[in-house]
Protein backbone atom coordinates (compact mmCIF):
# COMPACT_ATOMS: atom_id res chain seq x y z
CA UNK A 1 0.00 0.00 0.00
CA UNK A 2 1.14 3.54 -0.75
CA UNK A 3 -0.08 6.98 0.08
CA UNK A 4 0.52 10.68 -0.32
CA UNK A 5 4.31 10.48 -0.23
CA UNK A 6 4.54 8.17 -3.23
CA UNK A 7 2.08 10.31 -5.20
CA UNK A 8 4.11 13.45 -4.36
CA UNK A 9 7.37 11.84 -5.50
CA UNK A 10 5.84 10.65 -8.79
CA UNK A 11 4.25 14.06 -9.38
CA UNK A 12 7.54 15.84 -8.72
CA UNK A 13 9.45 13.58 -11.13
CA UNK A 14 6.94 14.20 -13.90
CA UNK A 15 6.98 17.97 -13.33
CA UNK A 16 10.77 17.97 -13.46
CA UNK A 17 10.77 16.09 -16.75
CA UNK A 18 8.23 18.07 -18.74
CA UNK A 19 7.03 21.58 -19.53
CA UNK A 20 5.72 21.99 -15.98
CA UNK A 21 9.29 22.58 -14.80
CA UNK A 22 8.44 26.29 -14.90
CA UNK A 23 5.78 25.69 -12.23
CA UNK A 24 8.42 24.31 -9.89
CA UNK A 25 10.47 27.49 -10.40
CA UNK A 26 7.42 29.68 -9.77
CA UNK A 27 6.70 27.98 -6.46
CA UNK A 28 10.34 28.01 -5.36
CA UNK A 29 10.75 31.71 -6.18
CA UNK A 30 7.73 32.53 -4.01
CA UNK A 31 9.15 30.42 -1.20
CA UNK A 32 12.49 32.23 -1.38
CA UNK A 33 10.83 35.66 -1.46
CA UNK A 34 8.72 34.96 1.63
CA UNK A 35 11.57 33.29 3.52
CA UNK A 36 13.88 36.25 2.86
CA UNK A 37 11.17 38.74 3.81
CA UNK A 38 10.48 37.03 7.14
CA UNK A 39 13.99 36.02 8.19
CA UNK A 40 16.44 38.13 6.19
CA UNK A 41 18.57 37.41 3.14
CA UNK A 42 21.44 35.52 4.80
CA UNK A 43 21.12 31.76 4.31
CA UNK A 44 23.54 31.16 7.21
CA UNK A 45 21.18 32.74 9.72
CA UNK A 46 17.85 31.96 8.03
CA UNK A 47 17.14 28.18 8.00
CA UNK A 48 13.94 28.54 6.00
CA UNK A 49 15.72 30.52 3.30
CA UNK A 50 18.61 28.06 3.26
CA UNK A 51 16.20 25.16 2.73
CA UNK A 52 14.41 27.00 -0.09
CA UNK A 53 17.68 27.91 -1.81
CA UNK A 54 18.94 24.32 -1.53
CA UNK A 55 15.76 23.06 -3.16
CA UNK A 56 16.11 25.66 -5.93
CA UNK A 57 19.70 24.61 -6.57
CA UNK A 58 18.64 20.96 -6.66
CA UNK A 59 16.19 21.90 -9.43
CA UNK A 60 19.00 23.68 -11.33
CA UNK A 61 17.47 27.11 -10.96
CA UNK A 62 19.90 29.74 -12.33
CA UNK A 63 21.91 31.53 -9.64
CA UNK A 64 20.73 34.95 -10.81
CA UNK A 65 17.08 33.90 -10.39
CA UNK A 66 17.77 32.84 -6.80
CA UNK A 67 19.62 36.06 -5.98
CA UNK A 68 16.87 38.18 -7.55
CA UNK A 69 14.21 36.38 -5.50
CA UNK A 70 16.16 36.97 -2.28
CA UNK A 71 16.46 40.69 -3.09
CA UNK A 72 12.73 40.89 -3.74
CA UNK A 73 12.15 39.40 -0.32
CA UNK A 74 14.53 41.77 1.48
CA UNK A 75 13.14 44.78 -0.37
CA UNK A 76 16.28 45.51 -2.39
CA UNK A 77 14.18 44.91 -5.50
CA UNK A 78 10.49 45.63 -5.95
CA UNK A 79 8.33 42.52 -5.73
CA UNK A 80 4.88 41.11 -5.03
CA UNK A 81 3.77 40.89 -1.39
CA UNK A 82 2.89 37.22 -0.89
CA UNK A 83 1.05 36.01 2.21
CA UNK A 84 1.17 32.50 3.62
CA UNK A 85 -2.31 31.02 4.08
CA UNK A 86 -3.41 27.55 5.23
CA UNK A 87 -6.53 25.93 3.79
CA UNK A 88 -8.11 22.70 4.98
CA UNK A 89 -10.76 20.39 3.60
CA UNK A 90 -11.88 16.96 2.53
CA UNK A 91 -11.36 15.21 -0.79
CA UNK A 92 -13.63 12.39 -2.08
CA UNK A 93 -13.75 9.34 0.18
CA UNK A 94 -13.28 11.42 3.33
CA UNK A 95 -9.58 12.05 2.65
CA UNK A 96 -8.20 14.96 4.70
CA UNK A 97 -6.36 17.66 2.73
CA UNK A 98 -4.05 20.31 4.21
CA UNK A 99 -2.90 23.05 1.82
CA UNK A 100 -0.20 25.69 2.24
CA UNK A 101 -0.50 28.60 -0.17
CA UNK A 102 1.53 31.74 -0.88
CA UNK A 103 -0.73 34.30 -2.47
CA UNK A 104 -1.04 37.99 -3.24
CA UNK A 105 -4.85 37.74 -3.18
CA UNK A 106 -6.43 35.55 -0.49
CA UNK A 107 -9.96 36.00 -1.84
CA UNK A 108 -8.95 34.80 -5.31
CA UNK A 109 -7.11 31.78 -3.93
CA UNK A 110 -10.00 30.79 -1.65
CA UNK A 111 -12.45 31.11 -4.54
CA UNK A 112 -10.30 28.97 -6.85
CA UNK A 113 -9.82 26.33 -4.16
CA UNK A 114 -13.53 26.21 -3.34
CA UNK A 115 -14.24 25.70 -7.04
CA UNK A 116 -11.79 22.77 -7.22
CA UNK A 117 -13.13 21.14 -4.04
CA UNK A 118 -16.69 21.36 -5.38
CA UNK A 119 -15.69 20.17 -8.87
CA UNK A 120 -14.13 16.96 -7.56
CA UNK A 121 -16.73 16.17 -4.91
CA UNK A 122 -14.85 17.45 -1.87
CA UNK A 123 -15.45 20.32 0.53
CA UNK A 124 -13.38 23.24 1.77
CA UNK A 125 -13.57 23.28 5.58
CA UNK A 126 -12.94 25.63 8.48
CA UNK A 127 -9.49 26.25 9.93
CA UNK A 128 -8.54 23.44 12.32
CA UNK A 129 -10.85 20.89 10.72
CA UNK A 130 -8.07 18.55 9.56
CA UNK A 131 -4.81 20.05 10.85
CA UNK A 132 -5.00 17.85 13.97
CA UNK A 133 -4.63 14.77 11.73
CA UNK A 134 -1.11 15.80 10.65
CA UNK A 135 2.21 16.10 12.50
CA UNK A 136 4.93 18.52 11.36
CA UNK A 137 8.13 16.53 10.84
CA UNK A 138 11.49 16.72 9.11
CA UNK A 139 11.97 14.12 6.38
CA UNK A 140 15.27 13.13 4.79
CA UNK A 141 15.18 10.91 1.70
CA UNK A 142 18.04 8.79 0.37
CA UNK A 143 17.91 6.62 -2.75
CA UNK A 144 18.37 2.99 -1.82
CA UNK A 145 21.06 2.51 -4.47
CA UNK A 146 23.16 5.20 -2.73
CA UNK A 147 23.24 3.23 0.52
CA UNK A 148 25.92 0.56 0.81
CA UNK A 149 25.55 -0.10 4.53
CA UNK A 150 22.01 0.38 5.89
CA UNK A 151 23.06 -0.32 9.48
CA UNK A 152 25.71 2.41 9.30
CA UNK A 153 23.17 4.84 7.88
CA UNK A 154 20.77 4.06 10.72
CA UNK A 155 23.43 4.52 13.39
CA UNK A 156 24.53 7.91 12.01
CA UNK A 157 20.93 9.11 11.75
CA UNK A 158 19.93 7.93 15.23
CA UNK A 159 23.06 9.39 16.85
CA UNK A 160 22.31 12.73 15.17
CA UNK A 161 18.74 12.80 16.54
CA UNK A 162 16.52 10.94 14.05
CA UNK A 163 13.19 9.69 15.42
CA UNK A 164 12.41 6.94 12.92
CA UNK A 165 13.74 5.28 9.76
CA UNK A 166 11.45 3.81 7.10
CA UNK A 167 13.39 1.47 4.83
CA UNK A 168 10.59 -0.64 3.34
CA UNK A 169 10.37 1.47 0.17
CA UNK A 170 12.64 3.49 -2.10
CA UNK A 171 13.71 6.16 -1.25
CA UNK A 172 14.60 5.38 2.37
CA UNK A 173 13.04 7.96 4.70
CA UNK A 174 14.54 9.31 7.91
CA UNK A 175 12.05 11.10 10.17
CA UNK A 176 13.16 13.86 12.55
CA UNK A 177 11.71 16.61 14.68
CA UNK A 178 11.67 19.78 12.51
CA UNK A 179 14.29 21.45 14.70
CA UNK A 180 16.67 18.47 14.29
CA UNK A 181 16.39 18.21 10.50
CA UNK A 182 19.42 20.36 9.68
CA UNK A 183 21.69 18.54 12.16
CA UNK A 184 20.75 15.05 10.93
CA UNK A 185 21.11 16.15 7.30
CA UNK A 186 24.57 17.63 7.98
CA UNK A 187 25.82 14.48 9.72
CA UNK A 188 24.66 12.28 6.84
CA UNK A 189 26.28 14.56 4.26
CA UNK A 190 29.52 14.57 6.25
CA UNK A 191 29.43 10.76 6.00
CA UNK A 192 29.16 11.03 2.21
CA UNK A 193 25.45 10.47 1.68
CA UNK A 194 23.48 12.39 -0.96
CA UNK A 195 20.21 13.40 0.65
CA UNK A 196 17.10 15.48 0.10
CA UNK A 197 15.58 17.11 3.16
CA UNK A 198 12.35 18.97 3.83
CA UNK A 199 9.87 19.82 6.56
CA UNK A 200 6.56 18.16 5.84
CA UNK A 201 3.28 17.08 7.45
CA UNK A 202 2.77 13.36 8.12
CA UNK A 203 -0.73 11.96 8.80
CA UNK A 204 -1.36 10.23 12.13
CA UNK A 205 -3.97 8.02 10.46
CA UNK A 206 -4.88 7.19 6.86
CA UNK A 207 -8.01 6.59 4.80
CA UNK A 208 -7.99 3.81 2.21
CA UNK A 209 -9.56 4.70 -1.14
CA UNK A 210 -10.25 2.51 -4.17
CA UNK A 211 -12.01 2.66 -7.53
CA UNK A 212 -13.73 5.92 -8.45
CA UNK A 213 -12.82 7.59 -5.17
CA UNK A 214 -9.13 6.78 -5.73
CA UNK A 215 -9.25 8.26 -9.23
CA UNK A 216 -11.05 11.40 -8.03
CA UNK A 217 -8.57 11.89 -5.18
CA UNK A 218 -5.53 11.71 -7.46
CA UNK A 219 -7.14 13.90 -10.11
CA UNK A 220 -8.06 16.44 -7.42
CA UNK A 221 -4.56 16.46 -5.88
CA UNK A 222 -3.01 16.94 -9.33
CA UNK A 223 -5.31 19.92 -9.93
CA UNK A 224 -4.35 21.44 -6.57
CA UNK A 225 -0.63 21.05 -7.28
CA UNK A 226 -1.07 22.77 -10.63
CA UNK A 227 -2.38 25.96 -8.97
CA UNK A 228 0.31 28.65 -8.91
CA UNK A 229 -0.76 29.86 -5.45
CA UNK A 230 -0.49 26.39 -3.90
CA UNK A 231 2.95 25.62 -2.48
CA UNK A 232 2.35 22.30 -0.77
CA UNK A 233 -0.48 19.79 -0.49
CA UNK A 234 -0.71 17.10 2.19
CA UNK A 235 -3.31 14.35 2.47
CA UNK A 236 -3.92 11.11 4.36
CA UNK A 237 -5.08 8.76 1.61
CA UNK A 238 -3.81 5.22 1.15
CA UNK A 239 -4.28 3.02 -1.91
CA UNK A 240 -2.89 -0.02 -3.67
CA UNK A 241 0.46 0.62 -5.42
CA UNK A 242 -0.63 -0.85 -8.73
CA UNK A 243 -3.92 1.03 -8.73
CA UNK A 244 -2.14 4.33 -8.06
CA UNK A 245 0.30 3.78 -10.92
CA UNK A 246 -2.50 2.81 -13.33
CA UNK A 247 -4.59 5.86 -12.43
CA UNK A 248 -1.65 8.27 -12.69
CA UNK A 249 -0.70 6.77 -16.04
CA UNK A 250 -4.23 7.42 -17.35
CA UNK A 251 -4.32 10.95 -15.95
CA UNK A 252 -0.93 11.86 -17.42
CA UNK A 253 -1.87 10.28 -20.75
UniProtKB/Swiss-Prot annotation:
The main location is cytoplasm
Instruction: Tell where it localizes.
Output: Cytoplasm
Decide whether keyword Ribosomal protein is in the record: no
Q: Which domain of life is it from?
A: Bacteria
According to the UniProt record, one GO cellular component term is: cytosol
Q: Which residues cross the membrane?
A: none
UniProt keyword terms in alphabetical order? Cytoplasm, DNA-binding, Transcription, Transcription regulation
Q: Which GO terms describe its molecular function?
A: DNA binding
Say which family it is in: Belongs to the TACO1 family.
* UniProt-recorded name of the protein: Probable transcriptional regulatory protein TM_0466
Q: Can you name the source organism?
A: Thermotoga maritima (strain ATCC 43589 / DSM 3109 / JCM 10099 / NBRC 100826 / MSB8)
Amino acid sequence: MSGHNKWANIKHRKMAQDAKKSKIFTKLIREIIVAAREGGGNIETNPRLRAAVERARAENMPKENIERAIKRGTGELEGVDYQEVIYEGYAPGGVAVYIRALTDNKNRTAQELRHLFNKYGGSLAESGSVSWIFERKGVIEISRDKVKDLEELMMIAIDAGAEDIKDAEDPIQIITAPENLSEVKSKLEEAGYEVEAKVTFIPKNTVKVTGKDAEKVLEFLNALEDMDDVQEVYSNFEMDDKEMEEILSRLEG
